[in-house]
Amino acid sequence: MGCGSSSKKGKKSEKVVRAALIIQNWYRRYRARLSARQHYALAIFQSIEYADEQGQMQLSSFFSFMLENYTNTHKEDSALVSRLFENTRLESKDREEYVGLIDVPDSYDGPRLQFPLTFTDINLLLQAFKQQQTLHAHYVLEVLFEARKILKQMPNFTRIQTFPAKEITICGDLHGKLDDLMLIFYKNGLPSEKNPYVFNGDFVDRGNNSMEILMILLVSFLVYPTDLHLNRGNHEDFMMNLRYGFTKEILQKYKLHGKKILQVLEELYTWLPIGTIIDNEILVIHGGISESTDLNILQQLQRNKMKSVLMPPMSTNQECNIKKNKAGPSEQSASEQLTKLEWEQIIDLLWSDPRGKKGCYPNTSRGGGCYFGPDVTSKVLNKNQLKMVIRSHECKPDGYEICHDGKVITVFSASNYYEEGSNRGAYIRLSYGTSPQFFQYQVTSTSCLNPLYQRVNAMEFSAFRILKERMIARKTDLINAFELRDHSRTGKISLAQWAFSMESILGLNLPWRSLSSHLVSTDSSGSVDYMSSFDDIHIEKPMKDMKSDLIETMYRYRSDLKIIFNIIDTDQSGLISMDEFRTMWKLFNAHYKVHIDDSQIDELASTMDSNKDGNIDFNEFLRAFYVVHKYETPESPLNK
């Protein structure tokens, strides 16, 4: 009896164990599938982000092209070239023009700063921003002017000592995400003499609270100028702000004085230090290095000459051409520009990314800077008697990443960067003679508390949504590529042919075969119905009878065109003349090799001038180009 009972219990236990193992294996496979989907979604987000930055960097070559051509065709208009290539000279203007003439009314119920600033003002600002109050333009401008005054006295690289017992915190990109900064201060404490910080660039753009972050950092810097350190990132650049949102944010929050704020901010960026060196061992820079990185050159160049990474130095011929066409004497000379070598040194510092492959080669994803391998890291560190590079610039799923045998650390402080739940944020604490300590976090909201599969669904939905927008902007080119391989005109090609066509046209370096089930229909034999790629999406036409190639071109380059025409609009009226539109479009057409007939452009310009006054509201026109999705929720067939 006893033995039989024991045998039954043993068999029952075996069944329980087997069932538990089956459930465990199923759950592991389930988590692996979710992890793969999350990985693909992040790959899409990052590829498109870098492709956009590549497009932004390509504007640099267009501006050089424009400099050669626009000044020849519009000799009477020197304001545009001045705006693009000449440094702002705020010193020649009375500060009272910006600050003194702006009164703070009694009705203003936001924070009132008292200069000279103290720790109380930092707290006041934090509490006000938590309550979604807006700092008055008078105080914003005063903070910008005061910060500029101190920044101008600082070297290109700030040097910090943690020896013997000091700790310092290093934060990466924040990108306008105020909740992340608040969480860092909550977990790690506010800046002070005993709690120093380095903020490693990219404070602004993308998020909705770039101004609030900038004001908190600058006010903290003014209170603790030797304990809070600010490095310039690639987004501390007025041209980047035009594309990625900070300019728009300022003009919306400060409708009356936004233009003044932008002008002062444009110059303040140029005075931000380009790096920090800790204990003569650790180099903290925003992007990275290259095999030609020379700290001697970087420490001696005049950083304020770098107005924008998109504004390359003028050649002597270009400078002479501008002077010849200007009505008055030129205030800018070649000596007031960076040399090409100096400009490239800063580009590498702000834009480069580490890779596992040895060597140094062009950063084709971003279009600026380089990829640098572990051998390059060792060479630059050894040459300068340094031990480590801490950089930011790249979103990492865990908020940080260590590579190059521990000699390069990436730290990224904006959690949920692409989408809720897409990544953690992190910061680093350093003290002398010890290994870096990493602290991770993630700002939580109602959606972040959802089950993992719902968060992955939401990420995946957003990722494929923006990928489809990329596809529709190249619809004509994609169809031509598909039809080139569809010799029998069946409307179908192989999966390999479809994947090759997608990569050759879009150039996003994505695993197209793995993504195909979300993007296209296949038959039982595995052949791809390539036109199904566009079944659930189209670009809205702002005008009837507009040709598809023109629609796609305008949509594809809408961000670039918006930047270009905002620069042409020197008086910020929102209007440009018909002649300016035609001339600039033809230059754009020639440089980007866009095949649009001049007759189409003339017709387009005439249609855009709705009231026939010779002016065009170009920003309003661009807003008329938008993509229509048939499915707008994560529960759509896209995710089933």
Swiss-Prot record:
Report the GO molecular function annotations. calcium ion binding; iron ion binding; manganese ion binding; protein serine/threonine phosphatase activity
Please give the residue ranges the record annotates as the region Catalytic: 122-445
Q: Which family does it belong to?
A: Belongs to the PPP phosphatase family.
Keywords recorded for this protein, A-Z: Calcium, Hydrolase, Magnesium, Manganese, Metal-binding, Protein phosphatase, Repeat
Task: State the gene name recorded for this protein.
Answer: Ppef1
**Residues where Mn(2+) 1 binds:** 173, 175, 202
The protein's name is Serine/threonine-protein phosphatase with EF-hands 1
Provide the top EC class: hydrolase
Taxonomic lineage = Eukaryota, Metazoa, Chordata, Craniata, Vertebrata
* Domain of life of the organism encoding this protein: Eukaryota
Residue sites binding Mn(2+) 2 per the record: 202, 234, 286, 393
